[in-house]
């Protein structure tokens, strides 16, 4: 992969102190990856260029919201296997956040165990307010915690999470860039009512990256955000390409259309992902999963041809012919999924207290 040498690894300074005794997890011994993993980055996979640096990254990354969040002491073997298959399949971009429960910890632990810490392209987030307007102490502590959890002394992309306190935090990120603590600064959101606000930072060329909700069903980003990103040379990460698993529920039991074979599409995950990453503005999609078999399906979207503009229209028309597609957002998220990490535990406790 065409990336400059990275020097990210550092000792986990005060690691146990940072996590708290109750959340501390053992660092795993080194584990070998499949012998062919280095070849997975060959020219046969779909790569995208980061406009601000010219380096290339694979167009399919890995998200970690809910899927990597497990309670301390619970089995994590499935997460280890997800990362292994992701890496062996050619993936390099992993997205996480301090808000994702134990997600950062799992990424850091297994990346270290596999010996890939220095080679990952990590995108992370800041959700910070401070003790008073202009106070950046919370942001600094968040960055330091993320570095310790991920075992990095530099984060590739740091983004203002959901535009929280964005006008105070974005200048902080720009300072961190100058100091070499991060490489790129960005903003994120996934809720459609905030897309207008998100678009302003892209249109004003104030960021290097933008992370946005975009899928074959949710295409609002095409109106302002994606055109502005193309015009200003801003990298675009896509969250929720599967609509929180709703798309899979919609097509459950349905065969792929015959024309999918023209693109080498073997499953619905690749259908949805190839549609997303074929947009010229998209740099990388970050589907999340806790299922190793699903990860193998996802990373397969890096191979084979991508749809052109006419094929994208055909793929969309096919989805529009399926009952329930237009009202997909009205259905419950994560159908059939059972996530039991710190986040879900806290949400359940809050709901119980409100009764």
Could you tell me what each predicted segment is?
Residues 50, 62, 94, 107, ...:
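Conserved, mostly hydrophobic/aromatic
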Residues 95-111:
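Glycine-rich, proline-tolerant flexible connector loops at the mouths of alpha/beta enzymes
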Residues 1-11:
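N-terminal secretory signal peptides
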Residues 51-54, 108-118, 147-151, 177, ...:
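Acidic (Asp/Glu)-rich catalytic clusters
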Residues 50, 224-355:
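Structured C-terminal cap/extension of enzyme domains
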Residues 129-220, 224, 230-237:
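Glycine/proline-rich, positively charged
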Residues 30-61, 74:
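C-terminal segment of N-terminal export signals and the immediately downstream linker at the start
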Residues 9-17, 25-42:
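N-terminal twin-arginine translocation
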């Amino acid at each position: 992969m065409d990336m400059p040498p990275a020097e990210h690894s550092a000792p986990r300074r005060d690691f146990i102190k940072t996590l708290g005794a109750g959340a501390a997890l053992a660092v795993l011994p080194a584990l070998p990856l499949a012998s062919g993993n280095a070849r997975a980055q060959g020219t046969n996979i779909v790569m995208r260029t980061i406009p601000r640096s010219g380096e290339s990254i694979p167009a399919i990354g890995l998200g970690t919201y809910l899927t990597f969040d497990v309670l301390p002491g619970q089995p994590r073997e499935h997460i280890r296997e997800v990362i292994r298959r992701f890496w062996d399949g050619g993936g390099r971009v992993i997205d996480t956040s301090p808000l994702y429960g134990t997600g950062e910890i799992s990424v850091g632990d297994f990346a270290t165990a596999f010996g890939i810490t220095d080679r990952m392209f990590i995108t992370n987030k800041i959700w910070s307010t401070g003790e008073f307007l202009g106070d950046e102490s919370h942001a600094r502590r968040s960055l330091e915690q993320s570095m310790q959890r991920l075992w990095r002394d530099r984060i590739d992309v740091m983004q203002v999470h959901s535009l929280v306190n964005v006008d105070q935090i974005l200048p902080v990120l720009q300072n961190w860039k100058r100091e070499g603590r991060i490489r790129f600064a960005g903003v994120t959101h996934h809720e459609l009512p905030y897309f207008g606000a998100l678009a302003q930072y892209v249109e004003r060329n104030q960021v290097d990256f933008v992370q946005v909700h975009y899928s074959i069903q949710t295409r609002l980003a095409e109106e302002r955000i994606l055109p502005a990103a193309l015009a200003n040379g801003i990298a675009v990460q896509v969250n929720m390409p599967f609509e929180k698993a709703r798309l899979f529920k919609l097509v459950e039991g349905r065969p792929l259309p015959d024309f999918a074979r023209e693109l080498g599409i073997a499953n619905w995950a690749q259908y949805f992902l190839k549609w997303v990453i074929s947009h010229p503005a998209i740099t990388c999609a970050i589907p999340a999963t806790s299922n190793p078999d699903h990860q193998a399906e996802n990373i397969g979207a890096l191979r084979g041809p991508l749809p052109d503009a006419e094929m994208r229209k055909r793929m969309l028309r096919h989805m529009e012919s399926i009952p329930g597609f237009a009202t997909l957002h009205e259905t419950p998220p994560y159908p059939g999924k059972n996530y039991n990490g710190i986040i879900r535990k806290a949400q359940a406790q809050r709901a119980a207290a409100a009764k």
